[in-house]
Amino acid sequence: MSQTNANDLRNNEVFFISPSNNTNKVLDKISQSEVKLWNKLSGANQKWRLIYDTNKQAYKIKVMDNTSLILTWNAPLSSVSVKTDTNGDNQYWYLLQNYISRNVIIRNYMNPNLVLQYNIDDTLMVSTQTSSSNQFFKFSNCIYEALNNRNCKLQTQLNSDRFLSKNLNSQIIVLWQWFDSSRQKWIIEYNETKSAYTLKCQENNRYLTWIQNSNNYVETYQSTDSLIQYWNINYLDNDASKYILYNLQDTNRVLDVYNSQIANGTHVIVDSYHGNTNQQWIINLI
């Protein structure tokens, strides 16, 4: 296997799924049941979450604009659609990725002789496997594509005018209303070795770091390459517009606004995941 790559197929991560020879088109849920290729617009109906089943060793592929709907082979027909999750074998897929070309074959679990295929009219179907290029797909990690090496601001879901900010006279991270300061601007960078992200403050080029003490504060700190400086960034389970940031030192703990307060100067901490709004963040490019 080659070096870890952001587009490796990992459980619970979200991807664009494109023809291998045309990443300007992606799988698109164009109605409550129909799925086909469409021009890439980056909407939630074009983002797909992979859910791995360890017993079947296969994936469900859920669309992010309605996560009760998953990619389904309409057996015994050749067509595919999105349908309500019934846990049927026709709703699971083997994903076979070539780690050099990054091409993926999407093979149905119910009948492994059948693979997903796109047609010249952009419709999708299952067919017996051939060497044809229209049975090869690319998976592109949505968050990596959107955020890696980008300048961003992080807004708490608690209030539309409270942002992740370095304190004026210390390294401590707090909430503060937006005033277009370098203390509020962050460069998000992916690390292939850790398979996680760092967030670097533009003011001091120091990294968002979980300080493991009784307060569980977050500060900016010089790079130590410690897990406390790395974050798994993912969408909410059912919302591709909001994010949770999990600390790599303990992925049950996430970036959190203390006590759901919104006053300027409220501490940002790391706390156990519960998914409430004080752990939800909106990340916008600057």
Curated annotation (Swiss-Prot):
A single GO cellular-component term on record: extracellular region
PROSITE patterns, A to Z: RICIN_B_LECTIN
Key words, A-Z: Hemagglutinin, Lectin, Repeat, Secreted, Virulence
Keyword Repeat among UniProt keywords: yes
Record CDD domains: beta-trefoil_Ricin_HA33_rpt1, beta-trefoil_Ricin_HA33_rpt2
Domains as described in the record: Arranged in 2 beta-trefoil domains (called 1 and 2) each with three tandemly repeated subdomains (called alpha, beta and gamma) joined by a short alpha-helix. Only subdomains 2-alpha and 2-gamma, in the C-terminal beta-trefoil domain, possess a functional carbohydrate-binding site.
Protein name, per record: Main hemagglutinin component type C
Species in which this protein is naturally found: Clostridium botulinum C phage (Clostridium botulinum C bacteriophage)
